[in-house]
Amino acid sequence: MIDSIKKLFKPVQLSIILLSFAACVSQNTANVKTVGESKLITDIITSEDAQSTIVTVKGNVTLTYTAIKQELPLGLLVDFPETALDNIKTVYYPPENDTLNSIRATQLEEEGVTSRIFISLKQDFSYSLQPDDTGLHIYFSKTDSPAV
């Protein structure tokens, strides 16, 4: 009887080890996310034309956003829910201009990932938002007098 138990012990032990290994492998692969599933902010660019100073937030897909104008500190706060930053500078100082002081990008990871961009303004300018397939264009009007 002891001999038959000894003969069964090694196959049972080997089976337990293999099942444990298989369970670990399947758990790890279930948690993997591909980059294609994530919304990313890939760049922040500033430009100017005769009428506007333009901040362009580029993404790998169409970006969902909420924009709130702030008085203290003066600027525009733009939140991008379920969107991460993709290796971009977190603080940007544009070339000398009459509109923008700086642009700061942060990634918040409370209750999911949200990216926040704060555009610090020198004066209270009117603005407009124009989303497209690759991001968001924010136009600060130069031709209007600063908002009061």
Regions picked out by a protein language model, each given a short descriptive name:
Residues 2-5, 24-148:
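Signal-peptide-cleaved, periplasmic/extracellular N-terminal interaction regions immediately downstream
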Residues 2-14:
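Bacterial N-terminal signal peptides that target proteins for export
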